[in-house]
Amino acid sequence: MMEELLPAETSSFPGPIPTQSVSSDEFTPPPQTVRQKQVEARIKELGDRLARHQGVSRRAFFKTAAGMAAAFVAMNDVYGPIFGASLAEAQNPDLANERAKALSGQFIMDMHTHFLRDDTRLQNFVRSREAVGKAGWNPALAGKPQTLEDLKFANYFKEIYFDSDTKVALISGSGSEEPRDWFLTNEMKAEARAKVNKLTGSQRLMSHAIFMPGMPGWLEAVDKAIAELKPDSFKGYTVGDNTNKQLSKHPWRMDDEKLLYPFYEKLAKAGLVNVCVHKGLYNLSTSQKFPHLLNHADVRDVGKAAKDWPQLNFIIYHSAFRFTGGEGKNGLAQFEQTGRVDWVTDLAEIPAKYGVTNVYGDLGQIFAQSTVAEPRLCAAMMGMLVKGLGADHVVWGTDAIWTGAPQWQIEAMRRLEIPEDMQKQHGFPALGPADGPTKRMIFGENSARLYKFDAKRRAELTTDRIALAKADYEREGPKRTNLR
């Protein structure tokens, strides 16, 4: 039964969007910035006023489409007109609900999601959620211990499929020199995919197999995964062990002909043409702590590999965004001074520099981090990627559920526009309306093309068991967990 996959709700919903950057596995949560405090205060002010006017509690208001609109109005009040949101929408529940309903069927493939294995010991993910409560930024978590259960399959299923407009997801993972610290084994990811798709009667979940070049027996593990698990694509981390960087003994380069090219040959032969590679998320403090891995975190090895293997697609996760963990201000300062952002600009320039058309940018934490911390930086990076890679080479991914239910990111993307001054100065194209061609490509059409998710499969999603169960779930009222 579908209900068996839904956990009991354990916390109330504090606000429509997060008002502070919170960690994934990459960094500890930074303190709120002055502007983030201003946004939070403005959201609370609007929430109090509009909730009273509509005759509901502020908490109830924040669970509505009008509450979501109010949050982006507050963002615009602080950061300037970056998001498409109006006070009229926030004041009129019918108008907000009509917009939300019209967009709810939008085809969204989130090809960058996570949950943790049942026997995980990675308590750092729990500590990151608790830190938010201790800091007082998220009332729902204040004084309430978080548990690893919040990061396991049942809550993943709920937050991805019921608390957001996501239609299809890909379960990713991360390997480690320490076997116990793999987020999920490759077998576990394949089992989750089979479980969900059998339950729903459609293809709602895809899965990665993680490859770890240089590890003993790694190519044999690739052969086994191809033969037995049939992953939808492979994913690797060029820094090696990203979870325990202090243990990383096998960093690698994408253009290492001796080490990687035999792997690419296996993928091409098997028809698994999508190679997903984690890049970036290597801020200045991490660089100082682990300098030996720094040269593996950027994108200097992408161009040659892409040129040498035109039959493969290289999808760079997080679009190589460097400035995580409260360092978004450094990224914005760099952009304002130079027009560049490490290492997103470098990635966006690869097609022109190398004459290739097989390099893609996954959003992941590039969007989750910058949307809340520095919206103008977010707009700038989206402009770079769409201009350099092409709108048909940028793919949606949220890194959920480290970031809670991804609906707030979906709404941010729907409403985001590159400011006119930025468009004129840098030649960035406009992103256009929520359901316009550019955002449709990014949300789902590009990944559908990459993974051959055809019209028949898309049609099945409208009448499968999730579609039916979600209709009942929404009638009972939303219970999103839009954490950051």
Where are these regions (language model features)?
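Catalytic pocket-lining loop regions of alpha/beta-barrel enzymes
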Residues: S248-W396, D421-L431, R475-R484
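Divalent metal-dependent hydrolysis catalytic cores, especially in the metallo-beta-lactamase
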Residues: E130-E149, N155-D181, R204-I210, D232-S233, ...
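N-terminal secretory signal peptides
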Residues: M1-V56
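Acidic (Asp/Glu)-rich catalytic clusters
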Residues: K158-D165, N186-S202, V222-P231, K266-A270, ...
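Mid-to-C-terminal alpha-helical segments outside catalytic/metal-binding sites
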Residues: V56-V73, D94-E98, F107, Q123, ...
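Active-site gating/metal-coordination segments in enzymes
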Residues: G175-A297
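Hydrophobic faces of well-ordered beta-strands that scaffold small-molecule active sites
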Residues: M109-T113, A169-I171, M206-A209, F234-K235, ...
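C-terminal segment of N-terminal export signals and the immediately downstream linker at the start
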Residues: D48-V56, N76-T113
